[in-house]
Amino acid sequence: YVEKKIVNGEQVEDDLAADTRTFIYVEVLQSALNNDYVLCGRSLARGNDSNSFGSYNAEDLKTGKYERYQNELCHLNIFTWLGVIGMLLYSLIYIRSSYLAVYRSNSYFLKLIGVFIAFHWAYGWIEDTTNFDILNISLWSAIGMGLSSQFRAMTDKDFKQWVWGIFYKKKKHL
């Protein structure tokens, strides 16, 4: 699908079906192979070598490194920082939490949270940034709920009471 729009008085075409991710995968994997950090990662202090985005850091920010410290793909960031070992462990957290929430919980609501967790794991291969924001705080809270035996033991009624208890507190008269 091609969208036509007017930008600065000129007609511009945007191909909404264009592949905007493959080159990022190529850069990340090539950087890992060239710098020998496939297994254990490059550390949180470094990014992947990037011909497409590295010049900004090297030249404009004067770092001298043609690296991209963070990509818009969650799992590629984890791979760059922690390698295959870290990527597997990171994925196991998502998978275990989702599995427990879907198959080992008493609440329909927690089963939905398990599906939400599984969706985010899959979406992390396409676009799901690793930022400290409300989305990731919510995601990791959901992962914690899936891993919690207390939350999994809740019934739908218990879960509703817990949620309502967050917003409405009865005043205690002393």
Language model features with spans:
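Eukaryotic scaffold repeat domains enriched in small/polar residues
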Residues: 172-174
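Transmembrane alpha-helices of multi-pass inner-membrane enzymes
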Residues: 112-124, 129-169
